[in-house]
Structure formats: C-alpha cells, structure tokens
C-alpha cells in the first residue's frame, strides 16, 4: 500500500511559507489560506501515522455529534475530555455541531434534522447537489462556546461510490486536523454503509491553515519521521446511522510513531 504524505507536506508548506498572524487565542500562528487534501478511502483509512492519534476520542466525538448533544457529560462518561476546556460548569457548550446537524432551529419554532435529510436525499435523489450539512448557523454563533471550525460538508455520488468534502474555515494543523480528517472519513464510511454505497473519496478543504507558534517544535519533530501506510477500517453494520457504537468501529494495522504532546489554544 502506498504511503500518503499529503498532510506532512502541508505542515512543511506552512512552516516554510506561512505568514505570521495573530489570532483569537493570543498565541500567534504561521498561516496559509486555502489548501486541499484528497483521500481515496479504498486505499486505507486516513489516520495520521507520523504521530499516534487518539482514535477513541475521534469515534466517541463523532457519535456524540450524531446524538445531537451539546453537553460534555456523555463524552466524560466514556473517558473523552477533548471538549472540557470550552464547557461551562454544567458541561454545556451551547448549540454546537451536533445541535446544528440534528436540530437546526427554524423561524417558526420547528427544527431541521440535516443529517436525516441528507440520508433521505442520498436514497431518493443521489445526483442532488444539495446534500449539505452546515454547522455554521450565523444566528447562533454567539451562543456557542466555540464557533464551528469544520463548518460544513457535502456528499457526492458517482459510479456507486459516496464521496464527502469538508470545508474547515479554521484548521489547527497539528492538533485538530488529524482528528477532523479521520472523523469525516469515518462518517463517510458510515453513511455509505447506510445508503448501500461504496466509500469513495474524502476531500478536506482548509481555509485558514495554521500552525500555532507553540507547536512549531512539535511539528518539526513530526516532520523528521517517515510516514507508514494507512491502516484499514472495519465497520460493523448498524440498524441506522444513529445506532453505531464504539465497538462497531475497528481500525487494523495502525502502525504509528509515538504521540507528541502540545498545548491546546483555547
């Protein structure tokens, strides 16, 4: 199996050519604007290998999004703490990703389940160009603990294969993006299984692609490592997209370098 270097090449590009910019957190970044990575999901599961990525957190976070949840309590019950820094004392985050995916509020007081709508369209009109899910609800941004970084995604069907493209307006390349790539690749596999399609491509499109100044040492260490071939994903069928459990997801042959710790910019 071929070794994929797209992500590492992007890290190097930003280190070498990025513009020094300030940011909301006050940390400082090196940044470029606009970049795309394409992953053929039949060639392996895109879980970055030049450092260990915590798969448990990725899977539980995606299941939490699909629950439509806005409280970190369920994540904490399963030993996942990646959202704790942004939660209030009651564990609430406001109307973040899962809320927008599953219950986008309308002016008449009802709610739209965007995920269910996309599933229905995939089954009845797979050539539609409207199979989009958005977390970027302008009217509710001020109530969110963190504005959506991975803002919206679109599905596309061709030759019996399902592809997904994500637009990530703000891309923390060292800490966040490896999670996001794997999460949406997993979602694409799940949706494909539920709609009797084969997984096609996952396409990651980044807007502000940045490396925080306090991650430069870690990125340099990571770039000194040779990538391994991607692992394989085994997904046990579930009755619906909303019935998958952690135990249904198995990643095999994940050969990786050691984890690299870095501070989160809050």
Curated annotation (Swiss-Prot):
Q: Name one GO molecular function term.
A: thymidylate synthase activity
**Reaction it catalyzes:** dUMP + (6R)-5,10-methylene-5,6,7,8-tetrahydrofolate = 7,8-dihydrofolate + dTMP
Write out the coiled-coil annotation as residue ranges: none
- Provide the taxonomic classification: Bacteria, Bacillati, Actinomycetota, Actinomycetes, Mycobacteriales
- Keywords assigned by UniProt? Cytoplasm, Methyltransferase, Nucleotide biosynthesis, Transferase
The family assignment reads:
Belongs to the thymidylate synthase family. Bacterial-type ThyA subfamily.
Give the enzyme's main class according to its UniProt record, as a single word: transferase
Query: What is the source species?
Result: Nocardia farcinica (strain IFM 10152)
The processes (GO biological process) annotated in the record are: dTMP biosynthetic process; dTTP biosynthetic process; methylation
Q: Which sites bind (6R)-5,10-methylene-5,6,7,8-tetrahydrofolate?
A: 54, 172, 265
Pathway membership, UniProt: Pyrimidine metabolism; dTTP biosynthesis
Describe the protein's quaternary organization and the partners it interacts with.
Answer: Homodimer.
Q: What is this protein called?
A: Thymidylate synthase
- Main localisation, per the record? cytoplasm
């Amino acid at each position: 199996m071929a070794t994929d270097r797209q992500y590492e090449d992007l890290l190097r590009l930003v280190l070498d050519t990025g513009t020094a910019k300030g940011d909301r957190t006050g940390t400082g970044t090196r940044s470029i604007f606009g970049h795309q990575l394409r992953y053929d999901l039949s060639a392996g599961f895109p879980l970055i290998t030049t450092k260990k990525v915590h798969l448990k957190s990725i899977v539980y976070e995606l299941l939490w999004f699909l629950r439509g949840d806005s409280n970190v309590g369920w994540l904490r019950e399963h030993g996942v703490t990646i959202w704790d820094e942004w939660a209030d004392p009651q564990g609430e985050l406001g109307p973040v990703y899962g809320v927008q995916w599953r219950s986008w509020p309308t002016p008449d007081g009802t709610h739209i389940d965007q995920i269910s709508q996309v599933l229905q369209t995939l089954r009845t009109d797979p050539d539609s160009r409207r199979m989009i899910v958005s977390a970027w609800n302008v009217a509710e941004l001020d109530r969110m603990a963190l504005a959506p970084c991975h803002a919206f995604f679109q599905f596309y069907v061709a030759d019996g294969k399902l592809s997904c493209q994500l637009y990530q307006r703000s891309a923390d390349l060292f800490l966040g993006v490896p999670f996001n790539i794997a999460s949406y690749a997993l979602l694409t596999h799940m949706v494909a299984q539920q709609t009797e399609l084969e997984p096609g491509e996952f396409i990651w499109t980044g807007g502000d692609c940045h490396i925080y100044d306090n991650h430069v040492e870690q990125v340099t260490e990571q770039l000194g490592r040779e990538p391994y071939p991607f692992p394989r994903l085994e997904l046990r069928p579930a009755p619906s997209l909303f019935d998958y459990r952690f135990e249904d997801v198995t990643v095999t042959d994940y050969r990786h370098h050691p984890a690299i710790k870095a501070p989160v910019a809050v």
